[in-house]
Design a protein with these regions (language model features):
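TM-adjacent membrane-interface loops and short helices in multi-pass inner/ER membrane proteins
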Residues: 142, 279-320, 327, 334-340
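A membrane-periplasm/extracellular boundary helix in multi-pass inner-membrane enzymes
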Residues: 186, 207-273, 281, 287-288, ...
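Transmembrane alpha-helices of multi-pass inner-membrane enzymes
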Residues: 195-203, 361-414
Length: 550
């Protein structure tokens, strides 16, 4: 459970592929070891509906190359949900393993994040990445993902505190909680601060309710949750650490600590909020939704749609491959009806489950973990990453298991589990081999495997899973000439839907000019100028004197 969050392994053109494969590897290992069961019919129907919409969108659009990875992610979530349903029905050890794994991942990442904050990670070498001093992100390489892991760990720590009867273990909650709050400060994540507020206030309300209903003679040891004031103390502790961490980093310079802009409190000042580009981002996405409200732009097409659209107002200034809000993302790529069906169905399931009436510690932990991920999903896209898919799927299964039926023969069930695990191992092995192969073109020639040092691009054609990365490499490495203009124009037009960045746009414009498609070249140049004005100006300065005027 902990390894996908902790692994430092990255490489190749897509930074999250190895993390995704390791998450699937955890799913395969858990299938071979832990009991499983089917989730509820409603949950199965929801995952099936999502898969159907993605398939239909890919069939009628240009997202076919994204279809297999997306279906793989949905299959991973569904398999994790089966494991979670097994926990709910049989109360096996996986629920305990989920909490322990998150505790291990979160506490180790918190220590690593603080080391990164103070810029003292050189001794770890390749075991970690090194962000700019004054920021921590563990091995997740993104502050908000790091903050969400820390928040998940806080929920797991609360479960550990609630289910343990050992006074010594209960006393560890306070220092562990302090470390986790410090790590949230080091992340500088506003998402993490929002999650901390919700966790502190929500659990304080639960602790107050627990004490109100307890007998008068009950003592502190009789309560599962810490006292409400202790839980709420996490909020002023965050504020204090927001000043203390930069104060220590500056060697005791109070002025530097006050002026430090790396923390969340500074970023919540009015001047910071008015320049926040997420508002512009969502406004752009709403514009795109209004243009194609029924069927959307197609799965994986947001980045192209954003580049190709000339907005009447402010424009989000970089490549936009996610709406940073899950309902909006579903609406812009799959259409409003699909988004309403998927999100509305999920909200109906949550309402029917009545989480506010929950008492079982395992289910409460699952609700807390699910809530942390969903809060992040309203601001970014954690469900595009394997470790969060794994936790999300387990929580879905724990909260919505199928009704218990007559037990099946244990031998048949174990055989099915081993067969499913073996299937996952084959899929992971093929994907790892194919990705390693495709990654060779992104390495210097001397660093490539010997079989791929010559004619590398030709040997990479035909990849099932990573053809977009191969096409991108070909476009960016191949010069446009009159002889290959038609091929490069078709290829650049295809890659533009994968990554509409200046290097690709330039090849599309140059090939269109060589083919005599001046009007098309002018149209793409105008979009280039609006989307990337600095890169467009540099390109114009470097164009030959005899190049067509744009």
């Amino acid at each position: 459970m902990a390894w996908p969050f902790l692994s430092p392994l990255v490489g190749g053109p897509s930074i999250n592929v190895w993390q995704q494969l390791m998450s699937w590897g955890c799913v395969a290992g858990l299938l071979a070891m832990a009991p499983f069961a089917f989730p509820s019919k409603g949950l199965r129907a929801g995952l099936a509906v999502m898969a159907v919409f993605v398939v239909l969108s890919a069939a009628v659009g240009t997202g076919a190359t994204l279809l297999l990875p997306t279906l793989g992610a949905l299959a991973g979530i569904a398999t994790a949900a089966c494991l979670g349903a097994g926990v709910a029905q049989q109360r096996g050890p996986l629920g305990h393993a989920l909490a322990v794994g998150l505790l291990a991942a979160g506490l180790l990442s918190a220590l690593l994040g603080l080391l990164q904050y103070y810029g003292v990670t050189e001794f770890l070498g390749a075991l970690t990445s090194s962000p700019t001093s004054g920021r921590g992100w563990g091995n997740l390489r993104q502050p908000n993902q790091f903050a969400t892991l820390i928040s998940l760990t806080l929920v797991a720590a609360l479960w550990w505190r609630a289910t343990s009867r050992s006074p010594r273990i209960r006393r560890l909650f306070v220092p562990a909680g302090g470390l986790l709050v410090a790590a949230l400060v080091a992340s500088g994540s506003r998402t993490g601060f929002l999650q901390l507020l919700l966790i502190a206030i929500g659990t304080a309300a639960m602790a107050w309710r627990e004490r109100r209903r307890a007998p008068r003679h009950a003592g502190p040891a009789d309560f599962r949750l810490p006292a409400p004031p202790l839980l709420l103390a996490a909020i002023p502790l965050y504020a204090a650490l927001h000043w203390l961490l930069p104060y220590l980093a500056s060697g005791g310079d109070a002025g530097h600590a006050v002026a430090s802009g790396t923390g969340m409190l500074h970023r919540l000042q009015p001047a910071a909020v008015t320049t926040d580009s997420r508002v512009v981002l969502w406004h752009n996405v709403l514009t795109l939704i209004a243009q194609r409200p029924l069927a959307g732009w197609g799965w994986g097409e947001l980045s192209f749609a954003h580049f190709a659209t000339l907005y009447s107002g402010p424009r989000f200034p970089v490549i936009l491959d996610n709406a940073h809000n899950l309902p909006l993302h579903l609406a812009v790529e799959l259409g409003i009806p699909a988004a309403l069906l998927i999100c509305g169905g999920f909200l109906w399931m949550v309402g029917a489950a009545k989480p506010w009436c929950e008492r079982d510690p395992l289910r409460l932990m699952a609700w807390g973990l699910l809530g942390v991920i969903l809060v992040h999903s309203l601001l970014e896209y954690p469900l595009w990453y394997g470790p969060f898919q794994l936790v999300f799927g387990l929580c879905l299964g724990i909260l919505w298991p199928a009704s218990p039926k007559r037990p099946e023969a244990s031998g048949k069930k174990k055989l099915a589990a081993f067969a499913a695990a073996a299937t996952w191992v084959v899929i992971i092995g093929y994907a790892a081999w194919d990705y390693t192969r495709v990654s060779q073109i992104y390495l210097p020639r001397d660093a490539r495997m010997s079989a791929y040092r010559d004619d590398t691009l030709a040997k990479l054609q035909g990849s099932w899973l990573f053809s977009r990365q191969v096409d991108f490499a070909e476009v960016t490495l191949t010069a446009v000439t009159p002889a290959n203009a038609a091929h490069m124009h078709e290829l650049a037009g295809r890659v533009l839907h994968f990554s509409p960045e200046p290097r690709v746009i330039v090849k599309l414009i140059e090939s269109a000019e060589l083919l005599g498609r001046d009007a098309e070249a002018h149209a793409w140049a105008e979009r280039f100028r609006v989307a990337f004005p600095a890169a467009f100006a540099r390109w114009l300065d470097n164009r030959p004197d005899d190049a067509p005027e744009l």
